[in-house]
Amino acid sequence: MAGSQIKVPLPKPPDSDSQRLNAFPVIMAQEGKGRLLRQIRLRKILSGDPSDQQITFVNTYGFIRATPETSEFISESSQQEVTPVVTACMLSFGAGPVLEDPQHMLKALDQTDIRVRKTASDKEQILFEINRIPNLFRHHQISADHLIQASSDKYVKAPAKLIAGVNYIYCVTFLSVTVCSASLKFRVARPLLAARSRLVRAVQMEVLLRVTCKKDSQMAKSMLNDPDGEGCIASVWFHLCNLCKGRNKLRSYDENYFASKCRKMNLTVSIGDMWGPTILVHAGGHIPTTAKPFFNSRGWVCHPIHQSSPSLAKTLWSSGCEIKAASAILQGSDYASLAKTDDIIYSKIKVDKDAANYKGVSWSPFRKSASMSNL
């Protein structure tokens, strides 16, 4: 069994407003009872290289409703029927060119027609049928996808509420636009992340997030108490890269060896809203040969939180968060080695003070006080 862990203290980065990505405020329309106003959030995450092309990631949050039934006769005085909210939902429009006019983006959402269906293979899935999107987003990734299939627990807050025999539609309410450098758009192929071998050591990354929530809230029960009393602490892990096992029998491959490798890589971690809440890692130094497939040519990699922890990602839809700390953990790659060796932890991962916070949407699909019947 694995023994005790060795941990190097990490000094807390200086506080900064740019570390926070606050929640969308709840703003109700005056003319409509209980109707939430559509909102847009803009943020920039740049690589620092002036030659790097800028793009925009568009991510949407909203609600799934049953499609209204049509009657035989409709007059011009008939009010459009709005069905109750079934559950909250997230759908990424993907990357595309820079968009300039926020108000135009919000108005264009009226042209969106996205149908939602439930299906299953080895697990439950959600199928988004893209019937119509605004011309404004015609150069974004979603314009090339007529059908988007995804795991239901990653994109729908409460998939158990979707039942057979009902037609559903996705209504976008919140638009999150991230202007970023094109070099940031890199994710590791899933087969590479899942592969394990006795020939390498695995480097995992743990990011501790301070989530904005009340200690007596329902979500706080699944998290750790924040010793600073500023929210709750959630831990999320993902596979960062692999390191080749050293063959020099006279050398000690201990925490000092691992710390040296991490220092040379010069790792920095930040958070943004790209494929939903996403952890970004930048290796600004030397990347070992075995680790290079896990980063792009400029040393960047993105890890959407919903791939590692769908439940935490859905919590962040409606709650802001801040990166409290980040650590790299050296483990055996194959399970036999993992069970027999101790974790070696390197905690001196830099936190980008300008991009260490995530602003969620300050609504809750479980809060009964907010009526959304005519959104």
UniProtKB/Swiss-Prot annotation:
It is found in: Virion. InterPro entries: Matrix_C, Matrix_N, Matrix_Paramyxo_C, Matrix_Paramyxo_N. One of its GO terms (molecular function) is structural constituent of virion. It comes from the Viruses. Keywords: Viral envelope protein, Viral matrix protein, Virion. GO terms for cellular component: viral envelope. GO terms for biological process: virion assembly. Its main location: virion. The M protein has a crucial role in virus assembly and interacts with the RNP complex as well as with the viral membrane. Belongs to the morbillivirus/respirovirus/rubulavirus M protein family. This is Matrix protein. It comes from Mumps virus (strain SBL-1) (MuV).
